């Protein structure tokens, strides 16, 4: 097992040096990025990303995208955000902050420049009103970075939908 691990490390080093020489975006080590927010359920997403980083024996980074709306956040939301940042630090994440109003672009650009292999985000339970609605954060990220693994964790308990079955009547 030790020799297999050493062989894998050697292959990683060779691949990494080849990646640097060819200026490629492919990385061999796992680097998990979690997106921070003031959502009440963001703690669940942070814990999930931490478990992934531990399972993959990878680097764990937590990213907050500060937009121009940040100063207008309520004190309750700011406190929740601070609590989520503190939780990520406790779980071993390196905290990073980027600035910009296009959140999806900021996340994917940070991921590309930092060698992130997996992004963990929360899924809002907000429903779209119609087909031509603005794309969600996740949809934008998928377009901007098709080569990254993006894990979407539901913000709240998933709603189970019942499949309607046709009622059969028995004729007597």
Pin down the residues of each PLM region.
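Structured cytosolic domains appended to multi-pass membrane proteins
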Residues: 1-161
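Cytosolic-side membrane-insertion boundary helix
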Residues: 159-172
């Amino acid at each position: 097992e030790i020799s297999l691990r050493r062989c894998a490390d050697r292959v990683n080093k060779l691949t990494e040096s080849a990646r640097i020489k060819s200026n490629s975006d492919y990385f061999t080590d796992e680097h998990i990025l979690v997106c921070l927010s003031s959502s009440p359920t963001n703690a669940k997403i942070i814990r999930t990303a931490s478990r992934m980083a531990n399972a993959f024996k990878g680097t764990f980074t937590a990213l907050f995208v500060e937009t121009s709306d940040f100063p207008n956040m309520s004190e309750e939301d700011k406190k929740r955000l601070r609590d989520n940042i503190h939780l990520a630090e406790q779980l071993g994440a390196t905290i990073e902050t980027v600035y910009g109003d296009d959140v999806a672009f900021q996340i994917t650009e940070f991921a590309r420049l930092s060698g992130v292999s997996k992004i963990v985000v929360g899924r809002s339970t907000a429903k779209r009103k119609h087909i031509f609605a603005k794309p969600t954060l996740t949809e934008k990220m998928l377009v901007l970075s098709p080569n990254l693994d993006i894990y979407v964790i539901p913000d709240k308990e998933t709603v189970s939908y019942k499949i309607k079955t046709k009622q059969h009547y028995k004729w007597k």
